[in-house]
């Protein structure tokens, strides 16, 4: 027997109670999407995305709302991104985002910069630096950074 988290008299934890959806629209250089989950792993998620390309510059935005059905988490957040293709092989990238727990006000912020270098039609190498701050952590670990290097090959 399942649980009735929202007290509507219905089992909210069965395998057939979850739903995912996605709608997207694309026209020329504009891309829009909305996607979400209802009652998947006891969470409801809504995500909206917009992206626009102007010649060598690509701009992006994402908004997300996430609630769990147990009442312990209610988060909302956003991300801005930009990518600029310098020439046929190099793309510079930047991203900034923040997510806030609407229950207790804790906020996490992230900023990333990086670059891709195209080695061939299906292969690129990339590098990035990310800086994160989390107000929920009351210690020296509330700020942390990461550096990444990698290679991607598409078959």
Which ranges hold each PLM region?
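Outer-membrane beta-barrel proteins
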Residues: 1-155
């Amino acid at each position: 027997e399942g649980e009735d988290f929202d007290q509507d008299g219905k089992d909210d934890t069965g395998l057939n109670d979850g739903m995912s959806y996605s709608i997207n629209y694309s026209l020329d250089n504009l891309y829009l999407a909305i996607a979400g989950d209802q009652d998947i792993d006891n969470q409801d998620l809504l995500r909206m995305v917009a992206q626009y390309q102007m010649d060598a510059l690509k701009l992006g935005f994402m908004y997300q709302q996430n609630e769990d059905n147990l009442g312990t988490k209610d988060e909302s957040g956003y991300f801005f991104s930009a990518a600029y293709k310098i020439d046929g092989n190099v793309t510079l990238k930047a991203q900034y985002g923040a997510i806030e727990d609407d229950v207790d006000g804790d906020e996490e912020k992230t900023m990333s910069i990086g670059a891709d270098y195209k080695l061939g039609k299906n292969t690129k190498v990339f590098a990035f630096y990310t800086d994160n701050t989390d107000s929920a952590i009351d210690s020296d670990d509330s700020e942390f950074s990461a550096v990444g290097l990698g290679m991607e090959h598409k078959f």
